[in-house]
UniProtKB/Swiss-Prot annotation:
Plants contain two types of GAPDH: cytosolic forms which participate in glycolysis and chloroplast forms which participate in photosynthesis. All the forms are encoded by distinct genes. GO terms for molecular function: glyceraldehyde-3-phosphate dehydrogenase (NAD+) (phosphorylating) activity; NAD binding; NADP binding. This is Glyceraldehyde-3-phosphate dehydrogenase, cytosolic. Belongs to the glyceraldehyde-3-phosphate dehydrogenase family. Homotetramer. The gene is GAPC. It catalyses: D-glyceraldehyde 3-phosphate + phosphate + NAD(+) = (2R)-3-phospho-glyceroyl phosphate + NADH + H(+). The record marks H181 as: Activates thiol group during catalysis. PROSITE patterns: GAPDH.
Amino acid sequence: MAKIKIGINGFGRIGRLVARVALQRDDVELVAVNDPFISVEYMTYMFKYDSVHGQWKHHELKAKDDKTLLFGEKPVTVFGIRNPEEIPWGEAGADYVVESTGVFTDKDKAAAHLKGGAKKVIISAPSKDAPMFVVGVNEKEYKSDLTVVSNASCTTNCLAPLAKVINDRFGIVEGLMTTVHSMTATQKTVDGPSAKDWRGGRAASFNIIPSSTGAAKAVGKVLPALNGKLTGMAFRVPTVDVSVVDLTVRLEKEATYDEIKAAIKEESEGKLKGIPGHTEDDVVSTDFIGDNRSSIFDAKAGIALSKNFVKLVSWYDNEMGYSTRVVDLIKHIASVE
């Protein structure tokens, strides 16, 4: 099978990590990157040095000229174009474009990439109107006539596989989710203006910040059986990567906590292996930096109040796990074409 050729629009946290994932795989080929706000030299620096995931050590990396990055001998075309419809993805051979600016999350805005020759667009964020897919949960619902899709959010990618296992095995009556979420690039280093979210304008490295998240409700979009049964909120905390979901649910069928643990372990070692995970170790957040699984269930951290009411805890590297799923979704889409 020929390599799947991808382009990336927006070379921020997710864009750079999708590039790292793609460059280490044999089934995909990174052929182009677009970012109008940084030079090729700065792009090289930002890709090579990463405070969380460490220095890039897989290929020698250098700027060949102002329009080309070299990863070893492999050239990657670089554009610096603001308007998505003007980016010549087709000329660069990029069939699948990852829209990771965080700006063009609507279906119509993301579809502008198609005008430049892209065949499919994958939005690396939740979308209000593009169909959302979570690998390991509902990617098999994808149909080849869809040209713009969303990979949902990192938190939905953690929550949905866990919720699917619990709902399939025991049934979920209703539930509440809290994600304790590492800070992200949109937060403030010190207190600053944030008109739409006053708390979100407070210093990220100095506060625990209550925040909204649509991740739990979005599970209802990828798992219609749970539509209206889950909602949730977030606490943004002063860690730079790795987050954790606390899912508290009321079950239809009675189950002991040991039975729930066994069910999750079985699924994580079965056909979904590599997407959900399972641990019985005494872990903390930094133990999951660089983990490319979507959701790692922490068997020791959860508790049960009764056989119908339980709290389940699952970790995720909100950067690397999510970026890996973006590439996995592209691979699945290509297999359906």
